Amino acid sequence: MPQGGLGSRSREKLAAVLRDTQGTISPSQAARALKLSKSRAAQLLAFWASRGWLSRVQRGLYVPIRLESKTSEGPLEDPWVVATALFSPCYIGGWSAAEHWGLTEQIFRSVLVITTKKPRRRKRVLKGTSFILRSVGSKAMFGLKPIWRGRMRVQVTDPARTVIDMLS
């Protein structure tokens, strides 16, 4: 993927988009930040991705690339932020929450996401990160604790709910 610099106007636009978003960027968010049409914002996001400033996670969703990164094809910096953007309303639970709360010493390669949506595929792999999806009714959205990951609030099961979920 060719990487390159940006002109001053493009750099200002990218900075405005990054300031107004919370870890993930969609064309509608970019359009709002830049006061452009959604299609023009999508073109800009694709351009910035082609230049190595953003990484495309899936159609319509991008993440910023860290300045010290040598490539835009690396793993997701924060899979929980991407999960929240893709599957909301959702929460992080099971082994992923247990790892977060220090209830296990194991490090898991996949993220368990519980959502009220009905996903077509129960397992999604994005940028090398595996997301395991489980559907629940909206009444099961309790025992959650909001945590901050960067500038985004992510719902995760509290320690008691994590243990209960893992035992059931």
Regions found by a protein language model. Name each.
Residues 100-168:
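Phosphate-handling catalytic interfaces
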Residues 2-89:
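Short beta-edge/loop segments at beta->alpha junctions of small alpha/beta modules
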Residues 90-93, 159:
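Catalytic-loop motifs flanking and including active-site residues across diverse enzymes
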Residues 4-7, 23, 52, 60, ...:
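Residue-identity detector for glycine
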